[in-house]
Amino acid sequence: MEGPSSSSVPTASDAPSKYLLPSDSDDGIATSSAANVGARNHVTNTEKMEKEKKPSPMVLNVDPDYDYDEEDGGSCEEDQRGPPAPISREIVDGAIARRSRDRQISPGVKMSIGNYDDMEDDDEEAETPEEQKQRFLASMKRIRNQPQEAFDPPEDTEAMREFINRQVNDAMMFNRDNHIDYSPVNKPKEAKIIEGYLWGGIIGTGSYGKVKEVIDIYTITRRAAKIMKYEKLRKIPNGWDNIRSEMSILRRLNHRNIVKLIEVFNLPEKGKVYMIFEYCIGSVQNLIDMEPAHRLSIGESHAIFLELCHGLNYLHSKRVSHKDIKPGNLLLSIDMTVKICDFGVAEQICLFQSDGRCTKVNGTPKFQPPECVYGNHEYFDGYKVDMWSAGVTLYNMVSGKYPFEQQVLLRLYESIGTNPVEMPTNVELSKDLQDIIKRLLDKDFNTRPNISDVMQHPWFQTGFPEDQGLGRIMERMRTGDRPFTMYPSLQAMYDGAGSEVILDEDGNELVLPPPDLVKRGLKFFLELKILENLPGTLSLSSFPGFQTLEKRPGDGPPPSSDSGVVAAPDSASGDPLRRPSSRSMPTSAPPRPPSGAVEVVEAVAAPEAVVEDPVVEEAPAQQQEAPDRRRRGKRSLFSCIFRSRTDSS
């Protein structure tokens, strides 16, 4: 029961009629003068104390249902500070009425001391259960939507584990039974399958990401997957735009000298984009790096340049400018077919343009033309940019050098724009080869030849054995080991799977091809021991026993010889050695050999350095017909089946 106490003390004359004192009996109220005098003195003292202290109004809550019982430990004795404040009948009745109303609104007993007005405000502001529920839901939603910082978990390295084990063992020296011996658990490799592709090892890296070898588990076809992360694409200027442009261009191209785009898919939960291409074993740059002389033979360079021009002719017919032709972007398929790749900076020329005018400069500095790096033109021809890059690529393949080389980038640009082209001195180049290089490296793009002019050049139309897939190219195809990184994944899928069901990352069961064929193939290759240590890309170990172009002291232009034999003094023994090459030894355009050429070769060459050919006696007749294709007779069925890649007849 709640109610405000009186703020002022009544007079002595009103006290007998309005107040009930605890000492009053039920029969009546004492009216003696002594009592009145005592009450009057008490009231006077109380008024003085209240005037001095001036306390705030007090609220005395009294419960009418409370049954006082002295046995419970209660006491009604007067307070030590003075008699209790008197209570009137009106105050008690009002408190009882308010208590009844409070019970109807909110049942329960509540006792408090404070201002009555404040209590009413608290009752008015009290939240209903529905409001409390809404406030709780709002707070939970705010906590759930609060951004949280992502911290990378600490790397559990071998050194960290050893340190922890050492500390634990030192702390438990008193009990040898608790000693911990750490031995790493060799978990079996699990087959990684994403979007129907079994993933192998890395076969290449680049500025946009890395390339891995994969196998289509439904067709057992080797593919190459280019993996690009969202974060790296955002950091590269125009990274996303270049990727979208590459996808749109490759989807419209279909040529044997252009790498084929198989599929593109995106995994937002991993933050990666995947581009699936046809598989290639390496690049022209790998072939150059494998040679100790860092160059290729003239015949190999001609065969590669031949297919490069066919690919550029197709691109330019589709109004596409690659703008980044270089040996690293010329891939080699398993049959040594050249395929142009990396269309990240390629540009689609507008259909309504009469020329290949471009304004956006991209590419590798050493392969860029003067109009792009020297800054003396407002625009440039995208088709002529590809021809300049093709000329630098040809120069690099035949000599192992670049036409313009400087250590500082600005000096390189200045050299490209001002210095004349100098022919390499470490190799002997024919006049036709020098002429086509000079024309391709013409600093004026208006007079620089286009792809049609290059394909009509005499050196381009010259025949080489390498053009027919012979020579060193055929030797690589016949004796080389193909890069293969899928053996651990295949072994984990078929040999380690057992009777368990293989699931992809989404938990779906994979329908695999019959494993018996794959198991027999794996068993065969495992017995031969040729799949375990193969690298991901072409290297010197890919072609065991292959004779490369060795770099000699003072590697200068070799003397010409009708038989194709290069006699060079050896640094150790001084004996003449035949230039290392293939069985047919194509080092230049094969001239018409005179009679008795074979006997001269056998007499001059050292027996231990010569690669014997069992059919060398038939070589003059074959070489005699090789340069002139128009004199061939009617071809048989087998000739049509095994015809060369460059022969369209």
Curated annotation (Swiss-Prot):
Q: Subcellular localization, per the record?
A: Cytoplasm, Cell cortex
**Annotated protein name in UniProt:** Serine/threonine-protein kinase par-4
State the UniProt keywords alphabetically: ATP-binding, Cytoplasm, Developmental protein, Kinase, Magnesium, Manganese, Metal-binding, Nucleotide-binding, Serine/threonine-protein kinase, Stress response, Transferase
Annotated organism of origin? Caenorhabditis briggsae
Which CDD domains has this protein been placed in?
A: STKc_LKB1
Name of the gene:
par-4
> Key word Transferase present in the record?
yes
Q: Where is the composition biased (Acidic residues)?
A: 64-77, 117-129
Domain named Protein kinase is located at: 197-460
A GO cellular-component term linked to this record = centrosome
Q: Which cofactor does it need?
A: Mg(2+); Mn(2+)
Family membership, please give it. Belongs to the protein kinase superfamily. CAMK Ser/Thr protein kinase family. LKB1 subfamily.
Bias kind Basic and acidic residues: ranges: 45-55
User: Main site of residence?
Assistant: cytoplasm
Q: Where is the composition biased (Polar residues)?
A: 1-11
Q: Where is the composition biased (Low complexity)?
A: 597-609
